[in-house]
Amino acid sequence: MTQDEMKKAAGWAALKYVEEGSIVGVGTGSTVNHFIDALATMKDDIEGAVSSSEASTQKMKALGIPVYDLNSVDRLSVYVDGADEINDRMDMIKGGGAALTREKIVAAVAEKFICIVDNTKQVNILGEFPLPVEVIPMARSYVARQLVKLGGDPVYREGVVTDNGNVILDVYNLKILNPKELESQINEIVGVVTNGLFAKRGADVLLVGTPDGVKTFTAK
């Protein structure tokens, strides 16, 4: 089974967590694209979706799934999204696709976070994948200096502007032993919008595509 086939299996497995008549929170990325394809098969059974990125919005609209503004929605039963890394405590690094802020906002609203990944994303310690930090453009150099003080090596992601009009610093060489603490520390730096650690709001259910099928893990 190829990596993409494992992503597809995880994406389709998330369909069973979608409630009929509900509005579904939808993330961003290659694995989520498979979930969107799956969601389109039951588009007549749901009210619609809230999207975390322009890319996902366009894909869903093309498939005939109604997309709502989050401000007009009171309740999201589930949010389905991928991760760049996830540990056994359901802490994640996300934001490889630069949609981390909107992803974090939609995740905060949802009652349940369903994380869908292939088995290459499971790790013991977060940090091998660079940690994305969304930054107000004028604060880029200042924030980079503060991230160096925290032990990281920040690199400006050239040519990338987020859906919110901001820039991304990818922080390398962080060994993240306390994800919740680091998430707070980075978010307290003036000029940071948010960072790609999803530890305070981790996943509730993890669906992992493997060569042997989809494995399900639940937050302890």
UniProtKB/Swiss-Prot annotation:
Substrate binds at T28, G29, S30, T31, D81, G82, A83, D84, K94, G95, G96, G97, K121. The keyword Isomerase applies. The active site is at E103 (proton acceptor). GO terms for molecular function: ribose-5-phosphate isomerase activity. Keywords: Isomerase. Pathway: Carbohydrate degradation; pentose phosphate pathway; D-ribose 5-phosphate from D-ribulose 5-phosphate (non-oxidative stage): step 1/1. It comes from the Bacteria. InterPro entries: NagB/RpiA_transferase-like, Ribose5P_isomerase_typA_subgr, Ribose5P_isomerase_type_A. GO terms for biological process: D-ribose metabolic process; pentose-phosphate shunt, non-oxidative branch. The keyword Nucleotide-binding does not apply. One of its GO terms (cellular component) is cytosol. It catalyses: aldehydo-D-ribose 5-phosphate = D-ribulose 5-phosphate. SUPFAM superfamilies: D-ribose-5-phosphate isomerase (RpiA), lid domain (SSF75445), NagB/RpiA/CoA transferase-like (SSF100950). It is an enzyme of class 5 (isomerase). Its EC number is 5.3.1.6. Homodimer. Catalyzes the reversible conversion of ribose-5-phosphate to ribulose 5-phosphate. Belongs to the ribose 5-phosphate isomerase family. This is Ribose-5-phosphate isomerase A.
